[in-house]
């Protein structure tokens, strides 16, 4: 163990048996079990709020989370003399959800539904006071930390309008590029088709009930994980009955939690999986059913999911990344992402037709 690591861990009331490095953190074998020491990057203001969320989830019976341990002084983070800030989290013996295994993806979908069932403010509406230091998740007063208004869900209408403007700006720039490379030619060839999808998403949004769904979600105090993907879903190892409980799951890394329409998490998770599986209708339908079996999906939520899937998100992200990068050298990864987005358009079209009865 390095001297600095030892100095950080000495701030906690634990006995350390051994440590080993892992991706961006340090795994610690202790008398309390497996823990993860991680440096806080960026603002630390949300850490006490995050601690409150973890406490709330556990009181609701959702216990398999990477809750934050407090220091000997009762702080949520350990602050070092050199300015470094660290959190010590509960961790689990296990591995990330395997995106190649449908059974694990279905279990992860059901796990998300269980999380959403409990991930609401206990006193009804989500108010800023719940995050800025007056009333906490557990009803206690004045926990530190603040969530700005900009952290609340931005309206999809303004988001899509902005994204479409950005796509037009990228096209204008690409047309002016000389000489053009593989990325530029591919982008221009597919632009009209992809932009049509963006316009269709905006039009579908305008006639949907998504606005009411957002208001109702805020009224009920609905929260989202914010980054529910297979990296943050751990399949736990251990002694238990595999026939009765095939997979035991821990959900980790809630740092991006916020008030939002809860199926935004489902959209994000399902989109990531579908992009890796070529938008296979059967798998997507099974994942939706696995979620809905625990937390039924309303008509408005299905509309919301449809609108989100219509928008060419991967195409926009790739174009945005290109525009913000060094355009003199386009990475092969960006070219590959663009080609994938183009190639999967027909597959996604069939997915939307069969799952949501949407026809462009």
Regions found by a protein language model. Name each.
Residues 316-360:
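ATP/Mg2+ or Mg2+-diphosphate-binding catalytic cores
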Residues 263-296, 309-328:
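Active-site activation/catalytic loop segments of kinase-like enzymes and analogous catalytic loops
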Residues 18, 126-133, 139-223:
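ATP-dependent phospho-/nucleotidyl transfer catalytic cores
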Residues 86-99, 169-177, 269, 311-329:
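A glycine-centered beta->alpha junction motif in the catalytic cores
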Residues 6-29:
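ATP-binding glycine-rich phosphate-binding loop
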Residues 27, 68, 203-263:
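Active-site acidic catalytic loop and adjacent metal/ATP-binding pocket
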Residues 33-129, 136-148:
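ATP-binding pocket architecture of kinase catalytic cores
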């Amino acid at each position: 163990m390095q001297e600095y690591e030892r100095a950080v861990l000495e701030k906690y009331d634990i006995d350390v048996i051994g440590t080993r490095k892992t991706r961006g953190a340090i795994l610690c074998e202790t008398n309390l079990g497996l823990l993860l020491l991680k440096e806080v990057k960026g603002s630390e203001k949300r850490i006490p709020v995050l601690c409150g969320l973890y406490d709330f989830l556990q009181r609701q019976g959702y216990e398999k989370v990477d809750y934050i341990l407090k220091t000997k002084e009762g702080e949520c983070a350990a602050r070092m003399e050199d300015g470094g800030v660290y959190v010590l989290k509960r961790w689990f013996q296990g591995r990330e959800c395997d995106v190649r295994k449908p059974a694990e993806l279905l279990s992860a979908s059901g796990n998300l539904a269980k999380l959403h069932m409990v991930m609401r403010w206990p006193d009804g509406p989500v108010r800023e006071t719940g995050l800025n230091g007056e009333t906490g998740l557990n009803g206690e007063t004045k926990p530190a930390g603040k969530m700005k208004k900009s952290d609340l869900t931005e309206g999809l209408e303004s988001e899509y309008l902005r994204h479409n403007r950005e796509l037009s700006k990228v096209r204008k720039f690409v047309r002016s590029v000389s000489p053009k490379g593989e990325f530029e030619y591919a982008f221009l060839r597919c632009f009209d088709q992809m932009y049509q999808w963006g316009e269709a998403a905006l039009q579908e949004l305008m006639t949907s009930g998504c606005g009411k769904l957002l208001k109702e979600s805020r009224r009920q105090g609905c929260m989202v994980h914010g980054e529910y993907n297979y990296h943050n879903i751990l399949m736990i190892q251990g002694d238990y009955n595999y026939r009765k409980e095939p997979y035991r799951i821990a959900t980790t890394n809630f740092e991006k939690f916020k008030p939002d329409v809860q199926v935004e998490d489902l959209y994000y998770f399902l989109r990531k999986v579908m992009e890796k599986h070529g938008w296979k209708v059967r798998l997507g339908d099974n994942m939706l059913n696995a979620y809905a079996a625990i937390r039924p999906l309303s008509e408005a939520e299905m509309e919301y999911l449809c609108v989100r899937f219509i928008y060419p998100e991967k195409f926009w992200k790739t174009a945005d990344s290109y525009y913000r990068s060094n355009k003199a050298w386009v990475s092969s990864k960006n070219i590959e992402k663009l080609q994938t987005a183009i190639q999967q358009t027909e597959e996604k079209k069939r997915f939307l037709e069969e799952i949501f009865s949407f026809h462009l």
